[in-house]
Amino acid sequence: MNANSITDKQRLHFALLFTAAFLVSIWGVFIIDSAFELGLNVHGNRPREIRGLKGILTYPFLHSGIEHLWNNTASFFTLNALLFYFYRSLAVRVWLIMFFVSGALLWLIGGKGNHIGASGIVYGLASFLFVSGVIRNNLLLLRISLVVVFLYGGLVWWMLP
């Protein structure tokens, strides 16, 4: 075995560590906001409003309630773990691009109002996993693409107005 090779167990550990780190942060924000009634949701992404620019960075951490948070958690856990497991060398870069681009696009073209939740990242993860699996001509990654379409294909309907 090559000194630079990585075992499946190490890949899984890496994937779960990065996934858990983000989930702990969004759950932590939700619990603190709920416990102390801070009203943090006003800091969401408000498209085309100067005061909404900070929301590009904050909106994925804010959720309207436990059901909203749970729905984002379940999808995020699966898709993010797949990204970090199968695309280890690209994962951090892809994730950061999705984080910033989803927030910026929402600010530029989103509907009026205050947008909160990690759905933009979830849509980005699903899109990347699907497209990457199709264009890489790799049977395993193509299978992952099909799983993503099967499990999350309905996400596209939530993006349309």
Question: Which stretches of residues belong to each language-model region?
Answer:
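A detector for small-residue-rich transmembrane helices and their helix-helix packing motifs
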Residues: 2-161
